[in-house]
Amino acid sequence: MGQRVIAPELQALYDKGAQVYSYSKLGTIHDCPYNAYLTYIEKREQCANVYSSLGTVVHDTLEGIIEGKNTEADIGPAIENGLDELDMLGIDFPKTRDGGNGIRDKWISNMRCMARDWVSPKGEYEVEKLLILKLRDDRYLQGYADLIRVLPDGRLQVLDIKTSSQFKDEDLLHYGRQLVAYTLALEQAGFKTAVPCWIMVKYCKITYETGFGKRAKPSEKVLDRCKVGYTLRSIVRSKMKAAGYDSEQIEIVT
C-alpha cells in the first residue's frame, strides 16, 4: 500500500484543532511502547518481516479481486513473487525449535491451497474505507476498514482480511476492539450494522455428519486449508469402517 493522501474529512478535523487518533498507532503504543518510540518519535524505518510483507501481498490481491483489478488467477503468482523477493532480500520465516522450516512450509502450503481454491466473496463492497468515530467534540478515532459489505437488507458489515493464525479465545476481545470501533463509527454516521467478522484466509470450515440414521448430526471443524483433504479422508475412512467395509475396500476408495 502506498502513502495515503490526507482525506478531506480528516483535514477538516485537523483544521479545527481536534485531536485525531489513529487506531493502528494507538495499538502500537499499547502493545510495545519502545516500538512506538522508535516509529513515531525517532522516525526509524521499520524492518520488513515475512508476515507483514506477504500479508500485504495477499491482502492487496484479494481486495483487488473485489475491486475488479485482479482475478483469482493472480493470487498464486503474487504469493510466489512475494516469496522470491523475500528470498532475494534474505528475509526468512522463523525457524522451529529444532531449526527446521516447518513454519515456512506450513504457511506456504496453506497459502497455495488458498490460491488454488479461493472464491472471492460476492456482493456489494467498499474497500479501504475511512471511518471516523467521534469520542467527544475535540477527540476522534480514525482507521481504515479492509472491507465494508452492503447486505441485502441495507445493513453494513465490517470485514477484516487476516493471513495470520487464529486468535486464542483470551485474545478475541483485544483484537476485536478494532472491528467494534469501526462498527460504532458506522452506527454513529447513521447506518444500521451487522456483526463484524474476520476473513481468516489460512483456514476453512468444513461441515459433515457424524453418526448414522437417527443419530446422525451435523458437525463443523475449522481447519488449516492444507489439512482439509487429510481430515476428510480420515472421516470417510472412519465412517466406512463403521459401516462394515473391509480394509481393502476402504483403501481403494480413499
Residue ranges and their predicted role:
Residues 23-70, 128:
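Nuclease catalytic cores
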